[in-house]
Regions:
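Phosphate-handling active-site elements
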Residues: 83-96, 122-142, 270-283
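Conserved, helical-rich catalytic subdomain that frames metal- and/or nucleotide-binding sites
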Residues: 151-152, 156-254, 269-282, 291-295
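Short hydrophobic/aromatic beta-strand micro-patches
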Residues: 265-267
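Short glycine/threonine-rich catalytic loop with a Thr-x-Gly-x-Asp
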Residues: 106-115, 253-262
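DPxDG-like acidic metal-binding loop motif
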Residues: 74, 107-135, 148-150
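Short, basic/glycine-rich phosphate-binding loops at helix/coil junctions
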Residues: 52-67, 140, 215-226
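ATP-binding N-lobe of GHMP and related small-molecule kinases
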Residues: 1-107, 125-130, 170-172, 180-183
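Residue-level signal for inorganic ion chemistry
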Residues: 14, 42-44, 74, 112, ...
C-alpha cells in the first residue's frame, strides 16, 4: 500500500458576476477566485495487490460536514480516476480516502471541490498513467470549481461555467477571517432564486479588481470586492449580514459573502486585527464556524 497526503485549500470569490441561464441549464459566470490558507487534510491510500471480494473498493472516511459517501465529490473523483486507470492498464486498485474537514460545507468556500482536486492529485502521484489533460477533463466534469482547485496558482479569473481559467497575480500578503452560520445554502436553490427574483445587484468591477491585483494595490483591491448573490442570500439567511457587519466593525478592509454562501470573509492587513475579528465573531448570538488564516 502507498499513501499520499495533500492540503486541500479553500477559496474565496473576490468578485462574482452571474449571467442568464444557458440552454444546457447552467449559468455563465465571471469570478475572480483566490485560494486561502484554510484547508482540509486529505490522505489517500491505494492498494493494487488486493485480490479478495473487496478489490477495487473505494472508501471515504470523513470527520464531519460531509454528505453520503457516493454523493461525495472525493468519492466521485476516485471512482472516475479508477475507471480510467482500469481502462488504460487492466488493473484494479482499492482506495481509502481520509478527510480531516476544516472547511465548512455548503459555505461557498469550495471545500468539496478542494477535496476532489486533492484526490485526483494524490491518485496521479500514486498510480500515474493518467495524463494532465485527462485529469483536467475529469475535474471539469465533476464540478465548476474543481479545475481551479487543481491548479497550482492561487488566483484566477473564471469564466463560462467556471472552468475556463486565466491566471492572475496573487493578493499582497494579508489575512482572511471567515465566518459561516450553521444554516447552509444550496447552490442550486440560490441560482433558482436568482432566476426568479432577478435581484437588483451591485455593479461588479472585475476589470478594476484585476487591474488592482496587477498593481498590488491593496486598498483598490478591497474597494472592488463584490458578489451578486449576496443580497439574495442575506434575505434567505439574515445571519450572513450580521457576520459581515461584525467583520467590518472589527476593521476589515472589505467583507463579503463567498460564492453562493453562506460563509462570509473579511480581509485584514494586520494579523492582530484579524485575530480580534475572529474573537468578535465568537460573541455573536448564534453559532458561527470561524477561521483565521493568511491569503
Amino acid at each position: 500500500m502507498e499513501t499520499c497526503t495533500i492540503n486541500a485549500r479553500a477559496k474565496i470569490n473576490l468578485t462574482l458576476e452571474i449571467f442568464d441561464r444557458r440552454k444546457d441549464g447552467y449559468h455563465d459566470m465571471r469570478s475572480v477566485m483566490h485560494k486561502i490558507g484554510l484547508c482540509d487534510i486529505v490522505k489517500v491510500t491505494v492498494d493494487t495487490e488486493r485480490t479478495d471480494e473487496n478489490a477495487g473498493e473505494i472508501r471515504v472516511i470523513c470527520s464531519k460536514y460531509v454528505c453520503a459517501e457516493k454523493d461525495n465529490l472525493a468519492y466521485k473523483a476516485a471512482d472516475s480516476f479508477m475507471a480510467l486507470y482500469y481502462k488504460k492498464t487492466g488493473k484494479i486498485a482499492s482506495c481509502i480516502i481520509e478527510i480531516e474537514k476544516n472547511i465548512p460545507d455548503k459555505a461557498g468556500l469550495g471545500g468539496g471541490s478542494a477535496d476532489c482536486a486533492a484526490v485526483l492529485d494524490a491518485l496521479t502521484k500514486l498510480l500515474g498513467v493518467i495524463t494532465e489533460k485527462e485529469k483536467e477533463e475529469i475535474a471539469a466534469y465533476l464540478g465548476s470549481d474543481v479545475p481551479f482547485m487543481l491548479e497550482k496558482y492561487d488566483c484566477a479569473l473564471a469564466t463560462g461555467t467556471g472552468t475556463t481559467l486565466q491566471k492572475l497575480p496573487m493578493m499582497p500578503m494579508c489575512y482572511c477571517v471567515t465566518g459561516t452560520p450553521d444554516k447552509g445554502l444550496s447552490t442550486r436553490d440560490i441560482y433558482d432564486l436568482f432566476d426568479e427574483k432577478k435581484h437588483v445587484v451591485p455593479n461588479v468591477k472585475a476589470n478594476s479588481l484585476i487591474s488592482a491585483l496587477e498593481q498590488e494595490d491593496f486598498g483598490r483591491i478591497c474597494d472592488n470586492i463584490v458578489n451578486q448573490f449576496e443580497p439574495i442570500c442575506i434575505h434567505e439567511v439574515s445571519e450572513i449580514g450580521k457576520i459581515k457587519k461584525c467583520l467590518l466593525k472589527s476593521g476589515a478592509y472589505a467583507a463579503q459573502m463567498s460564492g453562493s454562501g453562506s460563509a462570509v470573509f473579511g480581509i485584514f492587513a494586520d494579523k492582530e486585527q484579524a485575530e480580534a475579528a475572529y474573537r468578535a465573531l465568537g460573541t455573536l448570538p448564534f453559532d458561527v464556524r470561524r477561521s483565521v488564516c493568511k491569503i
